[in-house]
Amino acid sequence: MPRRRKIAKRIVPGDPIHNSIHVQMLINKVMMHGKKSVAENIVYRALDVAAQRLNREPVDLFEQVLRNSSPTIEVRPKRVGGSTYQVPVEVKSDRRIALAIRWLLTAARGRSGKPMHERLALELVDAFNNTGATVKRREEVHRMAEANRAFSHYARF
């Protein structure tokens, strides 16, 4: 247990165009080497392309993508006696969104051949339609949790 005071959670302000905290989190994750304007350009272009393909508002589309790709349950290692069990635990809401954004970017960066805004737009469209690598990753995490359901009685953190 930490002996120092609890560190206050950093509050992320909304992005300049849509005033959405989640879009700003995506921009911050896309950003490399402190180049925020480049990251904003990538994210806004990707949201516009995806929104155009699906005839939706960009922020509504992104919120739906986060709902489709965020995990509700995951496994955490818990050492009991001499062995380590993978214990399924519920994911807190902040971590859900962070994982969904991280997986979305990993999947978009894993695609090849196109500029980043197009790869991100394609991944957004796939996640909106409940297909693609991001949703597959969520299903994989849920499968792991379901397979280790027998150890759920250890989940007393």
From Swiss-Prot:
This is Small ribosomal subunit protein uS7. The keyword Mitochondrion does not apply. One of the primary rRNA binding proteins, it binds directly to 16S rRNA where it nucleates assembly of the head domain of the 30S subunit. Is located at the subunit interface close to the decoding center, probably blocks exit of the E-site tRNA. GO terms for molecular function: rRNA binding; structural constituent of ribosome; tRNA binding. Part of the 30S ribosomal subunit. Contacts proteins S9 and S11. PANTHER family: RIBOSOMAL PROTEIN S7. It comes from Herpetosiphon aurantiacus (strain ATCC 23779 / DSM 785 / 114-95). InterPro entries: Ribosomal_uS7, Ribosomal_uS7_bac/org-type, Ribosomal_uS7_dom, Ribosomal_uS7_dom_sf. Keywords: Ribonucleoprotein, Ribosomal protein, RNA-binding, rRNA-binding, tRNA-binding.
